[in-house]
Each structure stands twice: as C-alpha cells, then as structure tokens.
Amino acid sequence: MSCKRHPGFGEKLTIRSVPVHNGFVMEASQDHHPSTSSRIGATGSSTGVGERQRERIIRAATLVFSRKGYDGARVEEIARSAGIPKGNVLYYFKTKKTLYRVVIEQVLSLWLDALGNIAVDGNPEEAIRQYVNRKLALSRNYPEASRLFAMEVISGAPVINDHLSGELRLWVEEKGEVFRKWQQDGLMAKIDPAHAFFMIWVVTQTYADFEAQIQAVTGAKGYDQEIYTDATGDVVEALVRGLGLKRDT
C-alpha cells in the first residue's frame, strides 16, 4: 500500500535500508534516540524555503497535538512552537484539521513501511523478527507520534476513520495474503492475519503509549537503552512463538 503524499512529506527515507516515505527521516536502531522535534517532518535533504517551512510546521504540530489532542491544540501554539507566524501555518495547511490529518497519516505511513517488502517466498520468522524490531525502535524514537495516533484511535478516529477503513484495511488484506500462504505451507500458525497485526501493533506500541506505566513499574528514568534492550528480545520471541513462525527450509 502506498499512502498518499501531502505537502511537507519527504521523498526517500530509510529505516535500516527499508524505504520509508512521507516526511520522516530516521535510523531505527535501538541505540539511537533522536529528539522527535528535530527529526519528524524532516526530509534529510536540501529543500526550498517553502518545503522547510512545511517540515518545521509538521514537527511542531506533532508535539503539540500529542500533548493537547486535536481539540486542545491551537494553531497559535503550533505556530509558536515552530517559531513562525500563525498566518504561515494556515498558508501551507488551510485548516487545523488538514494539518492534523497530515501528521497522523505520516505516523501511519512510517509504521506500515517498516514492514518492508515481505513475500510468500521469503523467510517468515526473519521477516517478522525484523518488523517487530523496527516497530519497537519507532516506539522508542518517536513516542509522541505513537501517542498521538493512539489518542486519535481511542477517540473513535473522527479525522482519519476513512483512511483506516480504506488504505489501512487494504494494506492489511494485501499483507494478509502473504500470511495465509505461509499458513498453508505450515510456516505460521493459523491466526487471522488482521489479528496477527493487531497483536504486533499493541505489543510494540505500548512501550510508547504507556511510557509512564513502564517507567513506574521498572523504575527506569526516561527511555534508557536497558529498557529496550531487555524488551526487544522478549517481545520478539513471544510474538515469533505465539504466531508459530518458522524458517522456510
């Protein structure tokens, strides 16, 4: 599935050599924790003034929306965070709703592209191991973006419901065909593909969405390396075993 491009989205981005589109630049390694405000929305290449303005607005909007939600966020606050006049924000994004949708779709696009190009003749176990590792890295590197998406969905997805029931549903159906072929070949447990994705998403995203809970229980101060080092191996093994994944021999 290819998510729609919007103003402010980049062209070519990478997560460990996996192509990612729509404005995020990151290296999704477990030992790298860039500031959300400094990376989301960036293309990583030289751009014109207009493109740089859009990138700055998107970065600022991600932070403000993640803290205040859609209803609580004000365009004036986004403009202040971006360090530009309110009029500039509305020049590039005509309404707050337009900007919010662009930010949310960026997050979703980044997550979906993290799966890479899985194929029926690929290695099921290795493909999902890599996917889970990338999703955990995204949760660590971009917790605000993850929480923003969670807030939108928990509230009933009023802004992006059509996107979820359209492009996201088609994406799950497309990738689900690969899962079904693996199941037919005895390389994956017979679990509904949609529910398999739900399990992967909820387990990996909880490390961002429930950061306060994880810190309280573990005693961690911030998202230090130890938390993700410990979690990654356990989460990957639990999902690989739970999904009954095997190497294609």
List the model feature ranges, each with a label.
Residues 1-41, 134-137, 141, 169, ...:
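C-terminal peripheral helix-coil segments that are non-catalytic and often amphipathic
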Residues 53, 57-65, 135, 239:
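Short hydrophobic clusters on alpha-helical segments that form packing/core surfaces
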Residues 53, 96, 103, 107, ...:
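Hydrophobic/aromatic residues within well-ordered alpha-helical segments
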Residues 116-145, 193-200, 229:
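Hydrophobic alpha-helical connector segments
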